[in-house]
Amino acid sequence: METIAKHRHARSSAQKVRLVADLIRGKKVSQALDILTYTNKKAAVQVKKVLESAIANAEHNDGADIDDLKVTKIFVDEGPSMKRIMPRAKGRADRILKRTSHITVVVSDR
């Protein structure tokens, strides 16, 4: 049974989160949690939280056994960008894009 968890509008760029997502794709859930625990990136904390949510959803909603679960799919899409202004010298200003992303984790016992 497939179970999904999502984190929308995560405050990291999709490019940075994809680096972490590629580490755990296809792994067993216990191994994926270990990898994320020792990965020294801000995105690893966000992905770990979504993975733990997917595990809890599978256990509570579908009655799945945690030992059998695998990360079957994980993908990161771009979310909306917040536009901000950075003041510069001589009265000028630059536009800054604060990028967000949507993290989706699918776990399955097959």
Curated annotation (Swiss-Prot):
Entry's Gene Ontology BP terms: translation
Keyword rRNA processing: no
Gene Ontology CC entries for this record: cytosolic large ribosomal subunit
Keywords: Ribonucleoprotein, Ribosomal protein, RNA-binding, rRNA-binding
Pfam families per the UniProt record, alphabetical: Ribosomal_L22
Keyword RNA-binding: yes
InterPro entries: Ribosomal_uL22, Ribosomal_uL22_bac/chlpt-type, Ribosomal_uL22_bac/org-type, Ribosomal_uL22_CS, Ribosomal_uL22_sf
GO molecular function (one): rRNA binding
Protein task: This protein binds specifically to 23S rRNA; its binding is stimulated by other ribosomal proteins, e.g. L4, L17, and L20. It is important during the early stages of 50S assembly. It makes multiple contacts with different domains of the 23S rRNA in the assembled 50S subunit and ribosome.
Family to which the UniProt record says this protein belongs: Belongs to the universal ribosomal protein uL22 family.
Quaternary structure and partners: Part of the 50S ribosomal subunit.
PANTHER family: CHLOROPLAST 50S RIBOSOMAL PROTEIN L22-RELATED (PTHR13501), LARGE RIBOSOMAL SUBUNIT PROTEIN UL22M (PTHR13501:SF8)
NCBIfam families according to UniProt: rplV_bact (TIGR01044)
Protein name, UniProt field: Large ribosomal subunit protein uL22
